């Protein structure tokens, strides 16, 4: 085969393979209007995590907006914002970056002796590379504005309670420090993890324990009240090799929800529930969980991870979850704002994000700059949108606009639309049942068995027939006409009904599984209590 032709063929195959990738692109009639990011920041975002973002000028954005913290440029170390906890801004600092090697070389004579000395100095500096956590008080009148605690390696997440600092380090170790004495009270290292998700959860202090979100897909529970800090439980969520760190962790009373990129774990009063999927982000609010998935779904779940509602946007790459005014908002990476009404999860609105002046908001039609969001705002590069004041520019056809249904063009199963209609009518879907009729043979048998009517009976029958004829001649009422003209269910309606029945059966099955798991947990707890009681009796003897 001709070599140039072979190269051209390979190039065409590769190019066609790249073009096969599909992106979220709603039809024009589905786009309700334009959503602007009208507010400006002084500088653009250079780095962000789940709890904050750093701007180019060193300003820090937290979960309540712009803070008074400013991270100055220092040639001896780099700082990263981790979290704001218990009145402290927590910064992770790495002293690796600026070794004064060039100036030493320029000042020293280029002799073998000075080069050997320089190498010795460099080796000594490398041995003394420092990592530390700095706690900066957010109270300007505090007696001690800054506390620095040296670490063995770089800190990835941290939180404070009272005089204790809980830190998860890059070597997958959980550490507990006394802030006043800077003494290490507890440390336990897990298996190393080479790649992690940037959405790193922070440790959470409870009444008697602290929960560490580890990099290897597990939760380490440490008792810090009764004597020396002691690990009391390991909860394994996922065992994947890559990107397996805990990305989300929240405690709500007796309930706890944690997640990696592949699995969600919910602990409800001691009972565990799991959900597996490609998880982008999630948000827990007032007993309900909202999940973004890699395939463009927005899921609504209860605490037992039972799916309540869902919206599917084909090929959408979703980012950020903001709940405001009973609506859910999410950014789509190709330049759209998605709006879902929490009262009507069967539909959604799409708003396009336009170009702002000479600055193209989404370069190459892709959200590829720094992003951060809090309870009410979404920050992108140097702009932000406050959903408390969300005023999109509606297109002229918006007055006649129908919110995009989940069943349109394969967006989601059609039966969910019928489910919504059933909610409105407050009546379950029912199949029109036709009453069984007797066959002609059965009618003849009945006639033969009937006794012949007497004369009086014949008169009564004739009068009844005349009345029936009169009633037939009278005009038919609207209700009776509607009943007679009621069409038979179509094949589509029948399919919807069957799907609804399947979903109902599935929900009942989940409820039975829930009860079964609850019984198993109860039996296990009773068994453990019995074993402990026997052990105590043996010890007494």
From Swiss-Prot:
The encoding gene: pgbB
PROSITE patterns to which the protein is assigned, alphabetical: PROKAR_LIPOPROTEIN
- More details: Plasminogen bound to PgbB is capable of being converted to functionally active plasmin.
**Ranges annotated as biased composition (Polar residues):** 456-476
Task: Please tell me where this protein is predominantly located.
Answer: other
What name does UniProt use for this protein? Plasminogen-binding protein PgbB
Listed under GO cellular component are: cell surface
Organism source for this protein? Helicobacter pylori (strain J99 / ATCC 700824)
Function per UniProt = Binds plasminogen, specifically, and in a concentration and lysine-dependent manner. Plasminogen is the precursor of plasmin, a serine protease that cleaves fibrin, fibronectin, laminin and vitronectin. Acquisition of plasminogen/plasmin could enable H.pylori to degrade host components.
Compartment(s) of residence: Cell surface
């Amino acid at each position: 085969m001709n070599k140039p032709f072979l190269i051209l063929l390979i190039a065409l195959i590769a190019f066609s393979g790249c073009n096969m990738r599909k992106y979220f692109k709603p039809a024009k009639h589905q786009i309700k209007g334009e959503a602007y990011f009208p507010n400006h920041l002084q500088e653009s975002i250079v780095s962000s995590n789940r709890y904050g973002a750093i701007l180019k000028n060193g300003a820090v954005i937290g979960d309540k907006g712009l803070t008074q913290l400013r991270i100055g440029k220092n040639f001896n170390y780099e700082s990263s914002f981790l979290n704001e906890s218990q009145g402290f801004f927590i910064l992770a600092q790495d002293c690796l970056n600026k070794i004064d090697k060039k100036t030493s070389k320029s000042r020293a004579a280029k002799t073998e002796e000075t080069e050997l000395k320089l190498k010795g100095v460099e080796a000594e500096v490398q041995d003394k590379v420092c990592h530390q956590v700095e706690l900066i008080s957010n109270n300007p009148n505090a007696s001690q504005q800054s506390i620095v605690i040296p670490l063995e390696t770089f800190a990835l997440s941290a939180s404070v309670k009272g005089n204790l600092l809980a830190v998860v380090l890059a070597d997958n170790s959980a550490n507990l420090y006394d802030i006043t004495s800077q003494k290490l009270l507890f440390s336990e290292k897990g298996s190393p993890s080479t790649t992690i998700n940037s959405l790193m959860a922070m440790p959470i202090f409870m009444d008697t324990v602290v929960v560490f979100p580890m990099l290897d897909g597990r939760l380490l529970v440490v008792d810090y009240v009764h004597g020396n800090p002691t690990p009391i439980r390991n909860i394994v969520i996922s065992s994947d090799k890559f990107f397996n760190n805990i990305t989300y962790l929240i405690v709500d009373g007796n309930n706890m929800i944690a997640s990696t990129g592949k699995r969600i774990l919910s602990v409800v009063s001691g009972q565990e529930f799991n959900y597996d999927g490609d998880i982008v982000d999630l948000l827990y609010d007032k007993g309900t969980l909202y999940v973004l998935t890699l395939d463009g779904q927005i899921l609504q779940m209860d605490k037992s991870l039972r799916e309540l509602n869902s919206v599917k946007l084909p090929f959408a790459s979703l980012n950020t979850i903001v709940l405001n005014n009973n609506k859910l908002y999410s950014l789509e990476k190709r330049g759209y704002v998605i709006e879902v009404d929490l009262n009507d999860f069967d539909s959604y609105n799409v708003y396009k994000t336009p170009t702002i002046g000479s600055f193209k908001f989404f370069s190459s039609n892709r959200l590829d700059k720094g992003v951060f969001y809090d309870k009410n705002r979404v920050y992108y590069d140097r702009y932000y949108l406050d959903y408390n004041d969300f005023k999109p520019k509606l297109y002229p056809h918006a007055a006649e606009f129908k919110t995009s249904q989940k069943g349109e063009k394969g967006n989601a199963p059609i039966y969910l639309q019928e489910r919504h209609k059933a909610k409105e009518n407050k009546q379950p879907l029912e199949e029109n049942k036709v009453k069984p009729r007797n066959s002609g043979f059965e009618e003849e048998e009945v006639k033969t068995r009937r006794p012949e009517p007497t004369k009086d009976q014949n008169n009564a029958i004739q009068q009844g027939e005349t009345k029936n004829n009169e009633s037939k001649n009278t005009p038919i009422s609207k209700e009776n006409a509607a009943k007679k003209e009621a069409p038979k269910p179509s094949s589509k309606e029948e399919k919807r009904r069957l799907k609804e029945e399947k979903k109902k059966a599935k929900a009942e099955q989940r409820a039975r599984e829930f009860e079964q798991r609850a019984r198993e947990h109860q039996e296990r707890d009773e068994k453990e209590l019995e074993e402990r009681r026997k052990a105590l009796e043996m010890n007494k003897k």
